[in-house]
């Protein structure tokens, strides 16, 4: 794990650390994450814009389930990031759909985002200049809604040797820097979603 020396480090340094933090460790441990929301490589309709559960302002809110297996010894909590790097083609930046910190169990059921009280949720990218949602409404799962074509969504789980104690509504950068030096292992599962019922031309 590489640490940034200062917030004014070069773009290359920042990007390098970002990639390393988000690349699942291979061979060191055997932690795995899986989700029954993914069927034949695609997230089911109900977890995004083709579903039928939304926040008051229209954000898809029916959250995905997932299970973690073989976490390393010494794990005190998990941090979870659901992100869409393909959003760069439409918005110019990675879109974060779900942020979780201080998860102390190895499974989360579907639609738990709206009711769970034993883990902390951060603000997703629906709370941004583009999304324009208030942080409170966006501090839950914000489902998939790719505007241009089929996107790939990565569910990344980090096993940590500490509890982060971040406040509700934390941002990705706060989670990212709080995890520095505490990641024991990571695991990732990928599924796709589109707005054309799986028959997109692209």
Residue ranges and their predicted role:
Residues 22-202:
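N-terminus-centered regions that define maturation/targeting leaders and the start
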């Amino acid at each position: 794990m590489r640490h940034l020396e200062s917030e004014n480090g070069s773009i290359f340094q920042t990007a390098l650390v970002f990639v390393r933090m988000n690349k699942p460790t291979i061979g060191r441990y055997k932690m795995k994450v899986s989700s029954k929301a993914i069927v034949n490589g695609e997230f089911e309709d109900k977890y995004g814009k083709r579903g039928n559960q939304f926040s008051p302002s229209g954000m898809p809110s029916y959250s995905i389930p997932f299970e973690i297996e073989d976490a390393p010894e010494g794990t005190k909590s998990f941090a979870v990031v659901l992100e869409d790097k393909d959003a760069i083609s439409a918005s110019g930046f990675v879109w974060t759909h779900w942020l979780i910190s201080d998860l102390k169990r190895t499974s989360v059921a579907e639609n738990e985002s709206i009711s769970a009280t034993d883990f902390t949720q951060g603000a997703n990218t629906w709370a941004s200049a583009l999304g324009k949602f208030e942080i409170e409404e966006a501090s839950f799962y914000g489902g998939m809604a790719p505007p241009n074509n089929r996107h790939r969504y990565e569910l990344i789980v980090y096993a940590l040797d500490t509890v982060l104690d971040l406040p509700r509504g934390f941002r990705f950068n706060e989670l990212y820097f709080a995890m520095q030096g505490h990641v024991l292992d990571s695991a990732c599962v990928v599924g796709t979603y589109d707005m054309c019922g799986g028959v997109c031309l692209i």
